[in-house]
Amino acid sequence: MEEAKSQSLEEDFEGQATHTGPKGVINDWRKFKLESQDSDSIPPSKKEILRQMSSPQSRNGKDSKERVSRKMSIQEYELIHKEKEDENCLRKYRRQCMQDMHQKLSFGPRYGFVYELETGKQFLETIEKELKITTIVVHIYEDGIKGCDALNSSLTCLAAEYPIVKFCKIKASNTGAGDRFSLDVLPTLLIYKGGELISNFISVAEQFAEEFFAGDVESFLNEYGLLPEREVHVLEHTKIEEEDVE
């Protein structure tokens, strides 16, 4: 009965001259897995089949032109089938992890541009009423002050690349606390989260070269861990990971 089942599962295997190649290593591994089971429960006829499947076959001139027909045992079939199931489970698990990561980064409101705050009241409401998970970057500036225009342009670019971060700007004279933001401390960057000030940089333009751009500001903020991972990078990483699994 067992032999009849084995005959229904047939597959052709190339004869191998050595165990040093990848197929030889796989055959050795399968042999080890099968031999680790209770050998007393395997009929002699099936043992011979397993021995042939895990042992290299020598070739003469005639055999090199022919394929050697071998019978696959039920045990090896189940072993291979389990390997494929494990690979599929791993692929699904990693894909789910990547989707969860992307969902977390995409959760909450999206902005995408720099908000102009007109009054001190708007300034306070923006800080106090946003979700606690939202990072708020506020640029305190005045027209004609060195570095303010370049910083506004840089933040406009970053707002498009980090849509889950809220970028704002307000003139120092409109904050209601102009005495605290004198011209010599501009441009100033204030970063809030959960209604709390987590970082502030006065005269921030001094941290950059004479001419600076969005990439310079991005690198500066990343040094302090103030920006999340860009979504485009997450999507590219997800695609690469899925290709690696496949």
UniProtKB/Swiss-Prot annotation:
| Acidic residues bias spans | 1-14
The record's disulfide annotation reads none
In which compartments does the protein localize? Cytoplasm, Cytosol; Nucleus; Cell projection, Cilium, Photoreceptor outer segment; Photoreceptor inner segment
Q: Which domain of life is it from?
A: Eukaryota
Sites of Phosphoserine modification: S73
Q: How is it modified after translation?
A: Light-induced changes in cyclic nucleotide levels modulate the phosphorylation of this protein by cAMP kinase.
Any idea where the Phosducin domain is?
A: 1-244
One Pfam short name? Phosducin
CDD domains tied to this protein: Phd_like_Phd
Q: Where is the composition biased (Basic and acidic residues)?
A: 60-69
GO MF: phospholipase inhibitor activity
Chief subcellular site? cytoplasm
Region Thioredoxin fold, annotated ranges: 111-246
Disordered as annotated region, ranges: 1-70
Q: Which UniProt keywords apply?
A: Cell projection, Cilium, Cytoplasm, Nucleus, Phosphoprotein, Sensory transduction, Vision
A GO CC annotation given for this chain? photoreceptor inner segment
GO terms for biological process? G protein-coupled receptor signaling pathway; phototransduction; regulation of G protein-coupled receptor signaling pathway; visual perception
| Coiled-coil intervals | none
**Do you know which PANTHER family this protein is assigned to?**
PHOSDUCIN (PTHR46052:SF3), PHOSDUCIN-LIKE PROTEIN (PTHR46052)
State its role: May participate in the regulation of visual phototransduction or in the integration of photoreceptor metabolism. Inhibits the transcriptional activation activity of the cone-rod homeobox CRX.
Query: Subunit structure of this entry?
Result: Forms a complex with the beta and gamma subunits of the GTP-binding protein, transducin. Interacts with CRX.
Q: What is this protein called?
A: Phosducin
